[in-house]
Amino acid sequence: MACNITNQRQQTLSTSGEALYEILGLQKGASNEDIKKTYRKLALKHHPDKNPDDPAAADKFKEINNAHTILTDMSKRNIYDKYGSLGLYVAEQFGDENVNTYFMLSSWWAKTLFVIIGLLTGCYFCCCLCCCCNCCCGRCRPKSSAPEEDFYVSPEDLEEQIKTDMEKDVDFPVVLQPTNANEKTQLIREGPRSYCTDS
């Protein structure tokens, strides 16, 4: 049980980004050539085929190989240098391109800003109303650029407008009235359909 706890402590995710360099015996920021040279030496020294009697050699070889794989991939190396093994875990979960966003949104100031805006807007209720419903029964609605005038039309003016419109349309009177229909009237005629009103 005690061994399990120490293994868990060793496997905790760090943010320093130095453990992989220490496995290879290098300083943080070493060049790619130094990483390759050191990897070759350590891989030959700890290879399981050269050390069949030492069970720890296989584990050490896996650690060396993992460190080399991460430190030679520039994208993973940049993430590791900036955020440590926690950054690599986040990259594995959300993708390399989302690591910066994750750490930005999980920073103390982003969390604080989220809480403050939530409190000021009543659990974001006010933000939703402003965006969707113009808030507070329309009182916060943006003002229109044209001034609103009360538009009133008197019944006499409306009647005069209708007469004027009818005088303009005198050229096209309605001449065909609909035919009377009853229960026995056939609604669909037999034969070709005609949409003309001249018949």
From Swiss-Prot:
<feature type="modified residue" description="Phosphoserine">
    <location>
        <position position="14"/>
    </location>
</feature>
<dbReference type="InterPro" id="IPR051434">
    <property type="entry name" value="DnaJ_C_subfamily_member5"/>
</dbReference>
<dbReference type="Pfam" id="PF00226">
    <property type="entry name" value="DnaJ"/>
</dbReference>
<keyword id="KW-0597">Phosphoprotein</keyword>
<feature type="modified residue" description="Phosphoserine">
    <location>
        <position position="16"/>
    </location>
</feature>
<dbReference type="InterPro" id="IPR001623">
    <property type="entry name" value="DnaJ_domain"/>
</dbReference>
<keyword id="KW-0472">Membrane</keyword>
<feature type="domain" description="J">
    <location>
        <begin position="19"/>
        <end position="84"/>
    </location>
</feature>
<keyword id="KW-0449">Lipoprotein</keyword>
<dbReference type="InterPro" id="IPR036869">
    <property type="entry name" value="J_dom_sf"/>
</dbReference>
<dbReference type="GO" id="GO:0005737">
    <property type="term" value="C:cytoplasm"/>
</dbReference>
<keyword id="KW-0143">Chaperone</keyword>
<comment type="subunit">
    <text>Interacts with the chaperone complex consisting of HSC70 and SGTA.</text>
</comment>
<protein>
    <recommendedName>
        <fullName>DnaJ homolog subfamily C member 5B</fullName>
    </recommendedName>
</protein>
<keyword id="KW-0564">Palmitate</keyword>
<dbReference type="GO" id="GO:0016020">
    <property type="term" value="C:membrane"/>
</dbReference>
